């Protein structure tokens, strides 16, 4: 049978999602816990492989198993064998044709900036601290030129292994809640470091170092070296993965934490 899981994890203590030798990964921890419950070796496939330090509240995985267990066992039982910074949010048996990665039609990320002169000890690692008072409205306006299907070479990491820099951005919204700025972006898929590279350049606009039109210019240049440095991984969250309705994949409130849709000034549900 094939099982899908919703996964939440704090990426601070991991070298990314993907299993690697000699370093901790989210995939390895989850596979070990699932293998214990199934009493057989389990290999999982995810919707999106996040980088070192990046967290997820809406990650989706699937695996195949010969073990027959109730859905509660896959959730509660697996959680009992996971470290505190990884958790199963839901479990569901799915059709054989479902694939966590290839069945997905879109991924959604949120990047959280904490704009304050002094850093926060409590929030450390869960947000990116910015000592500048950024202009969220200018950042939002600047980001609108990135909508649609375009060549994102200017926001693509040099080590990106994708065959094409073209991606289709469905929405890019920048909102402020007090001292927090949330960059919310959804696309069919993302090239390597695309969200963090976009955020890095939007920060330059928000700080007043570049005009709103700069983002359009960067996009047209197709040159990563002209854009701003990559934003830190700390504030980035994979918050949702979208699938066709026929798979009936469970939906959770879009977070993370207190940043649910109803609290944001702009949201595309």
Swiss-Prot record:
The keyword tRNA processing applies. It catalyses: uridine(38/39/40) in tRNA = pseudouridine(38/39/40) in tRNA. Keywords: Isomerase, tRNA processing. One of its GO terms (biological process) is tRNA pseudouridine synthesis. GO terms for molecular function: RNA binding; tRNA pseudouridine(38-40) synthase activity. Disulfide bonds: none annotated. The active site is at 51 (nucleophile). Substrate binds at residue 109. Its EC number is 5.4.99.12. The keyword tRNA processing applies. HAMAP family: TruA. Formation of pseudouridine at positions 38, 39 and 40 in the anticodon stem and loop of transfer RNAs. PANTHER family: PSEUDOURIDYLATE SYNTHASE, TRNA PSEUDOURIDINE SYNTHASE-LIKE 1. Belongs to the tRNA pseudouridine synthase TruA family. Homodimer. This is tRNA pseudouridine synthase A.
């Amino acid at each position: 049978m094939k099982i899908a899981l919703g996964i939440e994890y704090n990426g601070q203590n991991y070298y990314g999602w993907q299993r690697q030798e000699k370093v901790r990964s989210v995939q390895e921890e989850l596979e070990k816990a699932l293998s214990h419950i199934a009493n057989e070796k389990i290999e999982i496939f995810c919707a999106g492989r996040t980088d070192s330090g990046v967290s997820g509240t809406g990650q989706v995985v699937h695996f195949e198993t010969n073990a027959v267990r109730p859905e509660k066992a896959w959730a509660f039982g697996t959680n009992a064998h996971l470290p505190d910074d990884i958790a199963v949010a839901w479990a569901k048996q799915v059709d054989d044709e479902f694939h966590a990665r290839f069945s997905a039609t879109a991924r959604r990320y949120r990047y959280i900036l904490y704009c304050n002169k002094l850093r926060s000890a409590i929030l450390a690692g869960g947000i990116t601290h910015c000592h500048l008072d950024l202009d969220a409205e200018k950042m939002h306006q600047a980001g609108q030129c990135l909508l649609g299907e375009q060549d994102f070479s200017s926001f693509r990491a040099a080590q990106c292994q994708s065959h094409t820099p073209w991606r289709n951005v469905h929405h890019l919204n920048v909102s402020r809640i007090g001292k927090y700025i949330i960059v919310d972006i959804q696309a069919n898929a993302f090239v390597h470091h695309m969200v963090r590279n976009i955020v890095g350049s939007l920060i330059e606009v928000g700080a007043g170092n570049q005009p709103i039109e700069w983002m359009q210019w960067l996009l047209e240049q197709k040159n990563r070296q002209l854009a701003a440095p990559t934003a830190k991984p700390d504030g980035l969250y994979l918050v949702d993965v979208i699938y066709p309705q026929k798979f009936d994949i469970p939906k959770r409130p879009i977070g993370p934490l207190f940043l649910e849709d109803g609290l944001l000034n702009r949201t595309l549900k």
